Amino acid sequence: SITIFKKINSLYVNIFILESMINNINDFKKHNNTDKREKNLNLILDSNSYKLAQEDLNLLRSDEMRGVRMLLEITKPELVLEEQNIISTIIVFGGAKIVEESSAQSKIDEVKNLLEKCPQSIKLKNKFNKLKNLLSMSHYYESAREFSKLASINNQDDKCNSHVIATGGGPGIMEAANRGAFEADCKSIGLNIQLPNEQFPNSFITPGLCFKFNYFALRKIHFVMRSVAAIFFPGGF
């Protein structure tokens, strides 16, 4: 009977050990399955498919969404200009390299000093001649600046913004036109274009009225949508 008791006791011990092993295996499987589910959920949340369409930059930049991007580009400036109560504009075009007289003269003096040290330099001679030509055109910078100042003062007030100066937002004549409005404490618009080598916006545009475009055609549309006049200075294309 003692032997039978020992065998029964041993059997119970083995059953207990087996149950413990099974429970451990089940716990491991459960824990492992939880980890896999958590990883899978993170992958779901991080995937592009789970992003809101308007937050998915890869989607918005795709060829298939070109129409949507064009609609956004035509709509955004229009909403801003309406909000700012811009009734009409005057477009000012001209060369990006034309600068004010003092700046042109300073560059000439700099090259002249270099030429005195290297009088045979063809490169410096060509640069000197180009700068002399720019100096002869510097009066156009002042003309654009003065015109924009007068046009802005006579047509803008707290309630109405008509004949607002609009440029490409770059340097040269564009800068001069924006500068004239700036010096008159009036609004002016800059319509920049995104290109690899395109200029940085000049610092005289009214904050909130400088727009960056990707499409040339839509930029041109916004140039003419509110325009009542266009002023063309030398240079540019």
Tell me what each language-model feature is:
Residues 236-237:
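Short Gly/Pro-enriched loop/turn and capping motifs at secondary-structure junctions
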Residues 28-33, 37-40, 44-191:
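Glycine-rich beta-alpha loop segments
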Residues 166-167, 171-233:
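Phosphate/pyrophosphate-binding betaalpha-module
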Residues 16-19:
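Family-specific functional microsites
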Residues 7-8:
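Polybasic, lysine-rich low-complexity intrinsically disordered segments
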